Amino acid sequence: MKLIILDRDGVINQDRDDFVKSVDEWIPVEGSMDAVAFLTQAGYTVAVATNQSGIGRKYFTVQNLTEMHAKMHRLVRQAGGEINGIWFCPHTDADNCNCRKPKPGMIEDIIGRFNAQASETWLVGDSLRDLQAIDAVGGKPALVLTGKGKKTLSQHGHELPEHTQVFDTLLDFSQYIMQENAAPQAD
């Protein structure tokens, strides 16, 4: 099982300081729909793991979130891709749950659901907490510089998990993965 987990806000869609609260505010990052399509066509299972504390803070509802995800699914399919599952944590930090990144609960659940190997699983995110969550299970962290990525690199570059790879965008990450898949494997 080849699994790639994507954070949502700042990776797939544009992030907002005041939370993405509605389908109208959910705007894809340029190239992200094509990136998911490329990963799908390269044989990867693509899942989304997203902290959505705006639900816990009562900024938007699960229904609003469902509408945003329906739009994301539709646009990804139009590009020729597939998102195989979406996991979200509705809690705030104060709830001290195990599913909110950087804790690994959501990531462990996704890896278990798809019967994947953690050591072979990528997580692409724009925040330190995304990278810490995949690192906690022994996976492969990738930082994109969209969303909060540039700020993460400048403020937390020294804290990034070892072996974190940095890409400008999700599209750049997908092209890297496709090149890796095309490279001849050593015996």
Swiss-Prot record:
The residues annotated as site (Contributes to substrate recognition) are: 100
According to its UniProt record, the EC number is: 3.1.3.82
Q: Give the required cofactors.
A: Mg(2+); Zn(2+)
| Origin: domain of life | Bacteria
Catalytic activity entry: D-glycero-beta-D-manno-heptose 1,7-bisphosphate + H2O = D-glycero-beta-D-manno-heptose 1-phosphate + phosphate
Family indicated by similarity:
Belongs to the GmhB family.
- This chain belongs to the protein called D-glycero-beta-D-manno-heptose-1,7-bisphosphate 7-phosphatase
Question: Which species is this record about?
Answer: Neisseria meningitidis serogroup A / serotype 4A (strain DSM 15465 / Z2491)
